[in-house]
């Protein structure tokens, strides 16, 4: 069996070309103004700084602007909330990204939820998640939404299929399950307390690795002909799924790197563009 590669890197590049055309149209209509993404980085974590830079570069590639706000490691919850409130009230800003994780003294959930729904382009607020869960309009969490866009492009059928999501985080596993449920898949969510995890994964037509541990999901847990989506990325340049033994016996898979990651960033930028289009009418 020759597996289909769900190439997120190439798809993101294609989407960027389409987005640039939309940005050009918007700028012509808005007297040269363009959507602006504000990124907030608290502390000096090198990986987080790299991710923020990548998001700024992606904005630039499609003709949008980004504003990078860097706060000290000692920033308090109150100080961060004040900065978010300032950005909420800045009509020139169309999207707000608070880079995860923040220092331990900060109430991250409170700060996520302080982002206005209209500017929650990373899909991290409880209000946005609740609306999405009820089938109402809201920006989706960037990684699961990026996965859905990837699966849609490659025409991976979800309706009637059994999807197993391994991981239940608030910004990945849970919204991933809800989006797949909305697409009429039958969804099982697994986590660290799940019993008989290998047996459950073996039942899956579609497996989503969202557990945050390198190659935690073993190749022999996955049945022939399944679709494998790996949302993990680790310093060893591997994901959450033991991928190498699978490439000759699954129907399709996301490579690591080059699969889910580029689509996460692309979705963040796309949703910022959508926010800008709404703001400019």
Swiss-Prot record:
Is Ubl conjugation among this UniProt entry's keywords?
A: no
Write out the similarity annotation. Belongs to the tetrahydrofolate dehydrogenase/cyclohydrolase family.
Name of the protein described by the UniProt record = Bifunctional protein FolD
Instruction: Indicate whether Hydrolase appears among the record's keywords.
Output: yes
Protein EC: 1.5.1.5, 3.5.4.9
Question: What does the subunit section of this Swiss-Prot or TrEMBL entry state?
Answer: Homodimer.
Q: GO CC terms on record? A: cytosol
Concerning NCBIfam families, the annotation shows: PRK14192.1
Listed under catalytic activity are: (6R)-5,10-methylene-5,6,7,8-tetrahydrofolate + NADP(+) = (6R)-5,10-methenyltetrahydrofolate + NADPH; (6R)-5,10-methenyltetrahydrofolate + H2O = (6R)-10-formyltetrahydrofolate + H(+)
Please, which domain of life does this record's source organism belong to?
Answer: Bacteria
**What are the GO BP annotations of this UniProt entry?**
L-histidine biosynthetic process; methionine biosynthetic process; purine nucleotide biosynthetic process; tetrahydrofolate interconversion
What are the record keywords, sorted? Amino-acid biosynthesis, Histidine biosynthesis, Hydrolase, Methionine biosynthesis, Multifunctional enzyme, NADP, One-carbon metabolism, Oxidoreductase, Purine biosynthesis
What function does the entry list? Answer: Catalyzes the oxidation of 5,10-methylenetetrahydrofolate to 5,10-methenyltetrahydrofolate and then the hydrolysis of 5,10-methenyltetrahydrofolate to 10-formyltetrahydrofolate.
């Amino acid at each position: 069996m020759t597996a289909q590669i769900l190439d997120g890197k190439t798809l993101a590049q294609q989407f960027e070309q389409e987005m640039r055309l939309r940005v050009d149209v918007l700028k012509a209509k808005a007297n040269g103004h363009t959507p602006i993404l504000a990124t907030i980085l608290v502390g000096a974590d090198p990986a987080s700084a790299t991710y923020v830079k990548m998001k700024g570069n992606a904005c630039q590639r499609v003709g949008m602007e980004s504003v990078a706000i860097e706060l000290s490691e000692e920033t308090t919850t109150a100080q961060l909330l004040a900065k978010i409130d300032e950005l909420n009230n800045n009509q020139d800003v169309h999207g707000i990204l608070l880079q995860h994780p923040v220092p331990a003294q900060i109430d991250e959930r409170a700060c996520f939820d302080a982002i206005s729904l209209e500017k929650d382009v990373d899909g991290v607020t409880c209000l946005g998640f609740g609306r999405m869960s009820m089938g109402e309009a809201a920006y989706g969490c960037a990684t699961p939404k990026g996965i859905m866009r990837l699966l849609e492009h490659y025409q991976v059928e979800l309706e009637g299929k059994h999807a197993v999501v391994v991981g239940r985080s608030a910004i990945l596993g849970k919204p991933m399950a809800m989006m797949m449920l909305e697409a009429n898949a039958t969804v099982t969510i697994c986590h660290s307390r799940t019993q008989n995890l290998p047996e459950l994964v073996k039942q899956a037509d579609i497996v989503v690795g969202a557990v945050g541990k390198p190659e935690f999901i073993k190749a022999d847990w996955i049945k022939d002909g399944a679709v494998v989506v790996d949302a993990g990325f680790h310093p060893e340049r591997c994901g959450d799924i033991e991928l190498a033994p699978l490439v000759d016996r699954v129907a399709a898979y996301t490579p690591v790197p080059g699969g889910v990651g580029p689509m996460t960033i692309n979705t963040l930028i796309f949703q910022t563009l959508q926010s800008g289009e709404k703001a400019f009418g």
